[in-house]
Every structure is written in structure tokens, then in C-alpha cells.
Amino acid sequence: MAEDYDFCLDNPLFYVSSKSIPDISKKFSVPLPDNWDEYKQNQEWVALFPLNSKIQRQGWKVHISSKIDQSEDILNIVSEVCFSMSITFKHLSSLEFFVKRNSKQIDRGVSGKFITCYPNENDLEHFLNILEEKLKKFDGPYILSDKKWKESPIYLRYGVFRDSNKEDGYSCDSQTLKINDKFILDQRLPQFVVPEGLQIPDFLISWISEEDEIDDKDSYVMPFLIEKPIIFSNSGGIYRGVFNNTKVIVREARPYTGIENNGLDAVSRTKSEKLALDKLSNIEGVPNCYWYGKLWDNYYLVTEEREGVALNHWLTQNYPLYDEKYDEKTSNNYLSRITSIVEQIIKIVKSAHATKIYHQDIHMKNIIIDTQDNVSLIDWEQSVYNEKDKRRHLVAAPGFRNWGYTTPENIDWYGVYQVANTLLYPAIVQSDLVYGYGKQTSIAGSKILEKFNYSKIEIENYIKLLDTLSKKIGNIKVLSPSKVLHPYLEEENYDTLENKKNRILKGLFEGFDSIYRRWEKEKRFFPVHYYGLNKNNGVAYSDLGVLWAYSQLLEQLDIPKNSEYEELEKHLVSKAIINIEGNSINDNGLLDGISGTIWLLDRLKYTREAARLYSKHFKKLISSSKNMRLYDGLCGILLVGIDFSSKGLLSKKVCEDVFNEIEKFTLKYINHPETFIPITKDNKKSNDPYKINGGLLYGHAGLGWLFGEMYHLTSIDIYKKALNVSIKNELKVYQVDKHGTLQYSQGDRILPYLSMGSGGLGILIYENYKIIDNEYKLILNKLYKAVDGNFCMFPGLFNGLSGLKVCQFFMNKYLSEVNNDLILEDYIDELNGYLIKIGNGVCIAGDGGMKITEDIASGFGGIVIALCCFIQNDFILLPKVKI
């Protein structure tokens, strides 16, 4: 099941639940008449209803939309009508939620709704007529899931009003309609749908069949042809089309939608872009504007389609990730190409500034590059025309937001600077977290290019270009809490491996203490990635997992546990046991649930308690497992069982039960593997652990880990057979790329990671090298090539550098490509590009690069476990049998 992640980015350092951030925006409220009541359904909605009254189970919902500056007036009018007619209604609770409901990225099926009314069908026509008369002078965004009533911002759709109850005579939830004794899904789509078989009131029949009114029929004749959509958002679509036999881009703007932090809506931004393009029409590298106007309710901007691809796509195709050493005759000469690209961008920006136009949203996706490396700068909708008006950079892509109050000119140059940094070292999102991070990426990027024998002069010239751009930005006084974070600029080129290793271990130790004292310990004791904010069990994201990693760090540094640590450990262990015994946990998996927590108790030397809990709850864990996967399913639960069995921690009876379950699991898998995990490529790109079906943690390779460990324990051939079947099935969703690497295929990308890709499969083959079929031994080299890249976006264990290097280390034991000490040294050197200096220590920004995390999957915990794998010469992330 896919998870809905409740998080926000308002905390400057950490991911936090949106519920933990107070809403300080203006609240919507109306006086409450006698015999009425009010309650908050949730943070977003306030419901008002007459006492001792009932509403229909389902019916015609009446939705009201509003312009932001008319919202209070509309609420007062609608509430008075509802009060007078005793009609239940609800409204958004605050201005913050109003803006979110009308923002660019909101689901189009729910956007625009400010007030929802629930009239009984007998009152519907009269209610609509009264509202229409009172709201004629108001405007609001079109609600795409509904149909507009007449001229006012009133919209209707048929849907569920409430859950069913005993009086209804049937049982169904708020997602289900009952039509003619059939139960159907109440779909919230971005289009008006009338449920099949619905009996429609007479006065609505003609309304449903008629087209929405258009003031001027001629205004709906499109002067351009739309060929296909590129993307949809709440603000409108972006399309490819044709205008006067010329290929064009058509940008649609829906009024009063796409409200951003600067208060501008989609139409305002489109008008701004039109003005900018007209003034820049003679500048090379800026697309021409061909047409602008209103059609029906929406506005359209038609611009020249520039040939080429977005610069971020160009980067993925050309960055020297696996290329051979630089050779003038054979290389694409990456460094000279990116120098030319940056110089072209500088020229365009200088020309625009000379006309007093400032782009304000320069980033990789807004730059188009053709096959000849010619550059175009597109998407001028954020443009401003006052160079001296200092402001905060409110609308920006991740990694491209300038710091503090600054001028529009400086905002543009910061964008160019960050583009240049990205082309040198693509992981620049951390720039939003750490002021001056570009100094760190320039060092890391230079080291990558040095591997390809680019001359020192070439590299220095590019660094000088970066320095020139940096001077255009100026210095900012950082006053936010993130001022405690600094770029990690330590030079360690000539130090010994032992000193490098000790330095990073000590840095992680000091940094952990600094973070612990800054983190507000309300529900969680450590900051984690948003994937794990609501998952405080299992190995991946739990507090106990972080504590295990920290305990491993103390052991490596030979630092005794102090009283504060011991008190915290006792508290977390006690809390974990109480939660398990209290049956208050729904997740049972190894990485996200109870079985993982029990395994961690053993890792923390609470072995007797871990064995007792597993024995007591084993059958319930098995019966309530959600799926078959290692990450969150039956496979991980059984794996903990054979780990404990091999150590003699379980009674004979429990061991027999575990072994019987594994035997049934294995036989069923051999005969019907497709029923365990789909053997098809994932079409959608995602790092979400609940949306992936490949790799060691989520795919057939994870099942293979269980089969391999069971064979090591029992030497029964059926488990060896199942292991080979699992590798065969895993490989069905892998592909070889142009560099000869073998990687997991997902959507239009391929992945080498420990959790989902080449690295994890390589670890499985390494651990079972002596018992797998020869054909699978032969692919180890291609998997090794996949993890032996020059760059990775993030530093973490599951989906980042740490996991890749651990996998490379163990695969190399059979391949002997390099000395394994060199792999550890490379890992530490490359990790320097991601480290953040805090106090006397260092910390890590997890996957995404936006916030500090300490979990095992993405942050501090994963770095520590990776280092321990190297130092202990053992893959310690997953349970393994003791023989």
C-alpha cells in the first residue's frame, strides 16, 4: 500500500510533521446561531450543522470557490443562507489552507473548493437560486471536478455526504456511493462525472447536458492547434501545438489558481511572461511570443518551441559517470562544453538585465540545450522589472533559492551560479540548507574531473568562472537557524586511511551530539527522513535503529556509554516493548515494523527480551503480515526467526514453527513466484519504499536473501533452488546500459542502489556465491560496474553513495578489481562532498538533500552502518544465520 506522507519543510533543519507547525495565518470564522454547532473535522476543514437535524447519505454537493480577496465576504453570505435554510456546510479553516487549495501543485480533483454545502435534494433548487442571486458579483477559480451552475462561483457534483449508519440499512464508507442497489466509487476526478444510473432532478437535466455559457462564442475559436499535453497542474496545462505552421508551446492559465508565496496567480504570471518575451524578442536564446489571449475562462500564451532538451536531462546523458579516461580524440570534452553552456547563459542574462528584465527562476529545467549545445532560457513567468526592489527569493527550484533579502539582479546571478555548480557537481540541493555550499561542491566536482585527466588549467579556469559568478551575488548575512551549518572544506588528500577513518568517525560522534541538542524531542528522539516520520519501528527509520547505529559508533571509537545514553537506551527499549505488548503497532515488517524492532533489541544486547517477544508474537506476526517482501512483509519476519533459531534463542517448538512456515513459503514461491512480487518493471519513477517491486529490500532479491540464509543453516536443496529462482526473477526487471552496467529498470531510469538495484543484487550474489548457478556468478562484473560510478546524488545507505560503496566492497572480494582499502578510502573522500559541518562535528542531509536526517535508510545511521560494514568486514544491515 502506498503511504501518504505527512510532513512539511517549515522547520529550517529537519523534516517535521505538518501537524507540529502552528498555522499562524488568518482564520476563517462566522458567528454561530442558536441551535447550531461547529467542530473542526481536521486541520483543514471546519464543519457547521444545525442541531437535531439529519443530512442525506449522498446527494448534490454545492461547492463555492472564491478569489482570495473576496473570501471573507463570500463566507459571510453563504453562511447566512445556510443558517436560514438549516443546511449543513463546511469551510476552509484558514488562509494558509485557502492558498494550498488553490496552489499550483494541488490535486486538480480537489482544487478550488472553499465552501462545501450539503443541501437535501428537496431544498437544492431554491438554495441554488438564492446563492446565485447573492454571489453574482463575485469570482473564483473553476472547480474542475464539478460543473458550474450559472454565472456565480457555484459548482455542483454528485457525491457522498457522510458515512452510512444503521438507519440507511447498508454499510459503506465516505468513498462509496449507492446507486440503484449498486455500490460504486465516489471518484474525485478533475472532470465532471454523473454516476451511471443516477436519477437526476428535473431542473438539473437540461443544465447537465448544456455547455457552460460563453460570453463571446467567437472567443472560443482557438487560433492554434493543440497536439499533445506535456504536463498538467492546477494552474492549467502545458501543451505542444502548432501556430501558423510553426511548432509552439501553449501555456494555459486558469484564473485565481496557482497562487504562490508571492501572491501571484497563474494569469498574473502568464501576463508577466508575455510582457518579458515581447521586450526580449531580439535577444538570441529567448523564445518568441506568437499569441496571447483569453479563450472561454482561461488565458493562453503561445510561444516558440525551442529545439532540444532541458539541461537537467542533458546532464544525465553527458555527465562523466562511467566514462573512460579523458582523451581529446574520443571524449565529448565535457568540461569545455559546460563552460560554453554557462557562458551562453551569462550572455542571455546580461542582455535581459540591460532591458531591465529579471528572470527570477533560473534553474536546470528552464534551460533548453540543442544538439549543437546552443542554449535557450525559457519560462519567464516570474519576471520582475524593478532592479532595486529588495526581496526574498520566494519561488525557486530546490537548490536554486537565493539567501536573505537581495535584489532581482542578484537572484538571477545566483541561479546562473547554481547552474554552473550543478554542471560540475550535480548534488546542489543542499545549498538551500547550507550557506556557501558551492565552495564544497566545487572541490568535490574538481576531484571527479581530475580522475579523467583534465588538465589542472582547464579545471582552474572553470573554478574561476564560478568565482566570478559568486562575486556577482555578494555576501548575505545568514540569520536563520541554519546559520549553525557550514560547508565541510577539510582537505585530506595526503592523510593516511586510518586518520581519515578516525576523523570521520569522531566527526559523526560530535555532530550527533550537536543535532541531539537541537532536535525538539516530542514524538521522536531523532530527526529522520519524511518517509519515516510516522514509522517508529523497524530498522529503516526508527529511533531504536538510530540508537543501534550510535552504539556501533561508540564501539568503533571505544567510547564508554555515559549515564545519559544509558537512560535514553532504557527509555527507548522500554517504550518499544510496551508498544509491542500493547498491540498498538500495525506494521510487522523487518524494516518498518515489529519484527525489525525485535531484531534491533537483540542487536542492542537485549537478547533474552527479543527472543521472548518473537516467540510470543510469532504466530500473530505471520498471520497479519501485509505482503511477502523483505522490507515490510512475511519474508523479513521469517528472516528474524531463522537468525534467532541459528543462535539457539528459540525453543524447539518455535523453531519448528518457523521452519514449517519457511518451507511452505518456499514451495509456494517456486511454483508461483509472480504471486509474491510482480515480475514486471515499475512504470513510475519512485524511491518510495511502498511503491517499488525490485531490489534487495523490495523485490525478489530480498526473498533470495531468506532462501540463501535458510540453505546455509539447513543445507536443504529446495532453498538453493528457490534462491536461484529468485535471482532469475529479479533479473527480469534489469537491463544493460551503454556502459555495460546491469541495473534495475524503473520507468525511464535505471538504478544501481543497495535497496533497489545492482548493489543489493550484488550483495546477495556475494553472500551466496558458492551455491548459486554459474550463470549468475558471471553477471557480478556488470553489477560491480554499476556501483563503481564517479558520482551519486545522495550520501545515504539505501539509495545513495554509502550503499553503493558497501556493495562494491563486498563484490570486489570475488572480482579483485582493486585493493579493498582503496574502496574505503574513495568512500571517505567522496563522502566529504556531502558532509555538513556543525559545531566540532559533521552531520548528513538525507535523501533529497533538504534536511538533516539520522535514520539508517538515508542519514547518519546509514553512514555509521556502512563504515562498520567496512571495518568489521561484514554486511551487518540484515539478519544472517550463525553457523
What are these regions (language model features)?
Residues 2-19, 171-228:
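Juxta-kinase regulatory segment immediately upstream of eukaryotic protein kinase catalytic domains
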Residues 27-46, 206-244:
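ATP-binding glycine-rich phosphate-binding loop
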Residues 58-68, 227-229, 234-273:
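ATP-binding glycine-rich loop module of kinase domains
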Residues 127-196, 418, 422-522:
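Helical subdomain adjoining the active site within ATP-dependent kinase catalytic cores
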Residues 138, 476-524, 687, 709, ...:
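Terminal, non-catalytic domain-edge segments
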Residues 288-299:
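Short beta-strand micro-motifs within the conserved protein kinase catalytic domain, predominantly
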Residues 349-369:
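Catalytic-loop of the protein kinase fold
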Residues 382-447:
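C-lobe/activation-segment region of protein kinase-like
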